[in-house]
C-alpha cells in the first residue's frame, strides 16, 4: 500500500490525440514533471543532450534512444558508445530525471527547492522549501536487451531506477543478466554520503556477481530470475530514514528489502532528492554498438505535501 500524499509527478497511461505522424512517448504518458537525458550531443557542447520538461511533454522522441512501442510502452535505449551527461560520468544513459517544477524555469533545478524533495526526517525548515516530502516511485517494465560484450564484471548490467541526492545515490536499482544465462538478477546499492560510511549492496533476486571486487565469480543462473522481455514491477519508497525496495511479479511473492538510512547523512540540512528512471548502461568496455534497452509501461512518483 502506498502512503497517503500529494502526487507531484506521475506517468500513467491515458488517451490524448497524437501530436505527430510518428507517435512519441508524450502522446501516451504525462511527461511534464520529468526531463530526459539521451546519449547524443546534437548541440556540440560536449555533453549528452538534456530534453527539458515542456519539450519532452510536447512530443519529443528520438528514433534511436527514446520511442513509443507498438504496445504503448516508453522505450529507453543506451549503447556503450555515446555522449555522457558530465565529465565525471563514464557510462551512457537514456534516463528520466524527476522535475517537480514542471517547466517553471524560475525555480532552480538544484538545491532544496520546489523542484526537488526531502525526507520527513530533514529539518522542518527544509521541508517547507522543498517540492515534496518523502517519495515513492512505482514502475512496471521489461528489460529487453543487455550488453553481451566487455569485461565479465560489467557485462549485462543496467540501472533501471534511482534516487539521486546532491552528489550521491541513496539507491541505484540494477537488473543484470549474464550472457550464458536465460534469466537475470535484481539488486541495489545504497550509497551513504561521503564520510557517512561505505556503499552497501543488497541482492533481491540472484546475485550481483561477478563484480569489480570478485571478477572470477561464476554464479549459477538464478532460479527465480527475470528473463529479458519479462514484465515485472518495482517500488522504491523513502520515508524518513527508511528506504524500502519491493519487487513484484504476477504469480510470485513480493521480494522486499529495507535499509536504515539514519546514519547515511540524507536527513541533514541542504540535502535534496529526486527520482530517476530509464536505462543507465553500466558497461563501458564492450563493443561500441552493444546496448541496454527497457520498456516502461507504467511509472508513477508520489510525495507528501510540504509542511
Swiss-Prot record:
A GO cellular component annotation in the UniProt record: extracellular region
Family label: Belongs to the polysaccharide lyase 7 family.
Protein known as: Alginate lyase
UniProt xrefs under Pfam families: Alginate_lyase2
Signal peptide: 1-20
Gene3D superfamilies named among the record's database cross-references: 2.60.120.200
Compartments it resides in: Secreted
Listed EC numbers: 4.2.2.3
Enzymatic class: lyase
Task performed by this protein: Degrades alginates that contain guluronic acid.
Catalytic function, reaction form: Eliminative cleavage of alginate to give oligosaccharides with 4-deoxy-alpha-L-erythro-hex-4-enuronosyl groups at their non-reducing ends and beta-D-mannuronate at their reducing end
Keywords attached to this entry: Lyase, Secreted, Signal
Domain of life of the organism encoding this protein: Bacteria
GO molecular function ontology, one term from the record: poly(beta-D-mannuronate) lyase activity
Coiled-coil residue windows: none
Native source organism of the sequence: Klebsiella pneumoniae
Amino acid at each position: 500500500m502506498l502512503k497517503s500524499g500529494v502526487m507531484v509527478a506521475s506517468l500513467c497511461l491515458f488517451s490524448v490525440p497524437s501530436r505527430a505522424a510518428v507517435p512519441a512517448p508524450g502522446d501516451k504518458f504525462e511527461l511534464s514533471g520529468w526531463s530526459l537525458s539521451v546519449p547524443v550531443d546534437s548541440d556540440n557542447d560536449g555533453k549528452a543532450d538534456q530534453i527539458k520538461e515542456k519539450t519532452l511533454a510536447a512530443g519529443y522522441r528520438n528514433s534511436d534512444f527514446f520511442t513509443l512501442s507498438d504496445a504503448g510502452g516508453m522505450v529507453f535505449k543506451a549503447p556503450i558508445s555515446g555522449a555522457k551527461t558530465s565529465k565525471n560520468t563514464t557510462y551512457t544513459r537514456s534516463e528520466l530525471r524527476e522535475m517537480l517544477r514542471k517547466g517553471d524555469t524560475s525555480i532552480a533545478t538544484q538545491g532544496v527547492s520546489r523542484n526537488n524533495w526531502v525526507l520527513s526526517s530533514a529539518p522542518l525548515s527544509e521541508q517547507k522549501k522543498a517540492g515534496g516530502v518523502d517519495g515513492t516511485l512505482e514502475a512496471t517494465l521489461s528489460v529487453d536487451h543487455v550488453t553481451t560484450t566487455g569485461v565479465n564484471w560489467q557485462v549485462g548490467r543496467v540501472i533501471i531506477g534511482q534516487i539521486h541526492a546532491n552528489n550521491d545515490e541513496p539507491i541505484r536499482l540494477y537488473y543484470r543478466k549474464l550472457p550464458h544465462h536465460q534469466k537475470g538478477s535484481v539488486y541495489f546499492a545504497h550509497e551513504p554520503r561521503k564520510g557517512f560510511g561505505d556503499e552497501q549492496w543488497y541482492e533481491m533476486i540472484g546475485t550481483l556477481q561477478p563484480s569489480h571486487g570478485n571478477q572470477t565469480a561464476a554464479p549459477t543462473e538464478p532460479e527465480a530470475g527475470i528473463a529479458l522481455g519479462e514484465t515485472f514491477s518495482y517500488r522504491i519508497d523513502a520515508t524518513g530514514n527508511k528506504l524500502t525496495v519491493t519487487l513484484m511479479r504476477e504469480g510470485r511473492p513480493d521480494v522486499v528489502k529495507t535499509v536504515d538510512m539514519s546514519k547515511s547523512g540524507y536527513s541533514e540540512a541542504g540535502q535534496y532528492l529526486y527520482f530517476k528512471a530509464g536505462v543507465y548502461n553500466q558497461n563501458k568496455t564492450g563493443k561500441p554498438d552493444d546496448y541496454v534497452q527497457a520498456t516502461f509501461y507504467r511509472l508513477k512518483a508520489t510525495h507528501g505535501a510540504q509542511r
